[in-house]
A protein has these predicted regions:
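A contiguous loop/helix-start segment that scaffolds small-molecule binding in enzyme catalytic cores
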Residues: 4, 170-245
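Short beta->alpha connector loops
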Residues: 11-14, 160-162, 182-184
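Residue-level detector of structured alpha->beta connecting loops
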Residues: 29, 93, 144, 173-174
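Conserved beta-strand termini and adjacent loop/short-helix elements that scaffold enzyme active sites
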Residues: 61-63, 130-132, 159, 204-206
Length: 245
């Protein structure tokens, strides 16, 4: 049986990886890594994988990672990527392939689409998942921000879903983490200011990577966009110890 394992390799720091992930990367027949189409530079997941796998076991798979809309270019990239992985299995029947993804493979990851399309092409494929540490967890740890306590709820929100839904999430959940804002950072900060939540928020960009930036959201320039790899945690308002129980 062909086996495809989606492995989370964490947000950036090569030590933020499970032992299981490290062991798999060290022994897999091949490690596929997603890279942006046409970008010759080292991919984000690839940079971490290089700490655990020799370069000759790494195969780059191109995706339309920077496309903002879901269109034909993205569809073609998924099909081409799945064809590449399926062709590898055709040449290595019964082998195990790892697909490395930043953070966790079940959180906004290209792995979801890839695995479904490869299974469609091959008919039979054992798909497994190894969880990874997310940027949200790294930022919470680095800033000493307990995400949730007692009966508090937590929402993970993609800013690409729009400012109105962000506002709604802030009303309905105790803690809200925002992903995928980058150029939408001024919009996210405006909502936080309007809802009185700016002082509850911390910001982290390029966590564990060169150029990392971690600061209270109220210290950010309200008009300047952030990089794609940026995360905001809006922490719950809390009373004293155990107040959320
Ligand atoms: C397509 S999602 C991938 C999420 C990833 N699978 C995870 O579990 O964290 C990309 C978003 O994750 C967040 N992110 C991932 N790595 C990050 C990092 N090193 N620093 C800050 N944010 C990061 C950003 O919000 C970015 O827009």
């Amino acid at each position: 049986m062909n086996t495809l394992v989606g492995v989370g390799v964490g947000p950036g720091d090569p030590e933020l990886l499970t032992v299981k992930a490290a062991n798999l990367l060290a022994k897999a027949d091949v490690v596929f890594v997603p890279v942006a189409a046409g970008d010759p530079g080292t991919g984000r997941a690839e940079a971490t994988v290089l700490h655990y796998a020799e370069a000759w076991r790494i195969e780059r798979v191109e995706f339309a990672l920077h496309d903002r809309v879901h269109g034909p270019a993205r569809e073609r990239a998924w099909d081409a990527a799945a064809t590449q992985v399926a062709a590898w299995f055709a040449a290595h029947p019964g082998a195990t392939a790892v697909f490395a993804t930043i953070g966790d493979p079940c959180v906004y990851s290209t792995f979801t689409y890839l695995a479904a399309t490869v299974r469609g092409l091959l008919g039979d494929l054992d798909v497994q998942l190894v969880p990874g540490i997310t940027a949200m967890q790294d930022l919470a740890a680095r800033t000493g921000t307990p995400l949730v306590e007692g009966r508090e709820s937590l929402a993970l929100f993609p800013m690409t879903a729009g400012a109105e839904r962000f506002r709604d999430a802030l009303e309905r959940f105790d803690a809200v983490v925002a992903y995928k804002f980058g150029r939408l950072l001024p919009e996210a900060l405006a909502v936080l200011r309007e809802t009185g939540r700016l002082d509850d928020a911390v910001y982290g960009a390029a966590l564990g990577l060169p150029g990392e930036e971690i600061r209270p959201a109220c210290d950010l320039d309200p008009d300047v966009a952030g990089p794609y790899l940026s995360t905001l945690i809006v922490a719950p308002r809390r009373g004293g110890r155990g107040s959320a129980l």
